[in-house]
A protein has these predicted regions:
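Short helix-loop capping/hinge motifs at secondary-structure junctions, enriched
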Residues: 138-148, 172
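An extended, acidic
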Residues: 153-208
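Short secondary-structure junctions
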Residues: 32-40, 140, 183-190
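Residue-level signal for inorganic ion chemistry
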Residues: 23-27, 52, 63, 96, ...
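N-terminal subdomain of lithium-sensitive/metallo-dependent phosphomonoesterases centered on the IMPase/IPPase/PAP
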Residues: 1-93
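DPxDG-like acidic metal-binding loop motif
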Residues: 82-141
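Generic detector of well-ordered alpha-helical packing
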Residues: 53, 76, 92-95, 126, ...
């Protein structure tokens, strides 16, 4: 479903594509070095790094330069209030735990919403040098090493043939623990942060 005019989609799509490339360059020029880690929680563990904050500041600055009236909501620095119909939702590093241990599956996640409805989404993977892009007009592609390729979900998967990716988070009740062996039989692939969901959109996985 197309929510915006074609010219608006082109404007925001070009901005986000350029931002993806800028984020990868920013990582290699400024953030590919030792960093500090702190815990957001008094009880439990929810890590945040100096790189999380640096990425979010960079993204906010790029948005504010181009669209100063838009609302911006980020994981690390909260919300910038605005009366605009447009809002940007930022997760500067999705997969901070992976980032901390050097796993390359972490990403920069950005969504542009119009009147509360997502219209454009970006998942950028700097280490893998690729990004996934989607619009509400049903156009999706992956850009890898500068080459774009259209992507589609696998609509022919069956229960017996499906490729399932999963992970367990938090504590599980005894009743739920008893169901784990049933899930493990189908769990052929580990869950790799937003990359697993990107692979779902690409048709490489069927269930996440």
């Amino acid at each position: 479903m197309q929510i915006l005019k074609s010219s608006d989609y082109k404007l925001y799509s070009k901005f986000i594509e350029n931002l993806a490339n800028k984020l990868t360059r920013f990582y290699y020029s400024k953030l590919n070095k030792p960093f500090k880690v702190s815990n957001k929680l008094k009880s439990g563990y929810d890590p945040v790094t100096t790189a999380d904050k640096a990425f979010e500041k960079f993204i906010r600055n790029e948005i504010n330069k181009k669209f100063p009236n838009h609302q911006v909501i980020g994981e690390e620095f909260g919300s910038k209030k605005s009366k605009s119909d447009y809002s940007w939702i930022i997760d500067p590093i999705d997969g901070t735990r992976s980032f901390v241990i050097g796993n390359p599956t972490w990403s920069n996640l950005i969504s542009l919403n119009y009147k509360g409805t997502p219209i454009i989404g970006l998942a950028n993977f700097p280490i893998l040098r690729k990004f996934y892009f989607n619009t509400s007009s049903d156009f999706s592609y992956v850009s890898e090493n500068g080459k774009k390729r259209r992507i589609l979900v696998n609509q022919k998967a069956t229960y017996s043939s499906m490729k399932l990716s999963a992970a367990f988070h938090g504590s599980l009740s005894l009743k739920k623990q008893k169901k784990i062996p049933q899930i493990l039989k189908r769990m052929q692939f580990p869950c790799s942060d937003a990359l697993s969901y990107s692979h779902l959109a690409e048709g490489k996985l069927d269930v996440v």
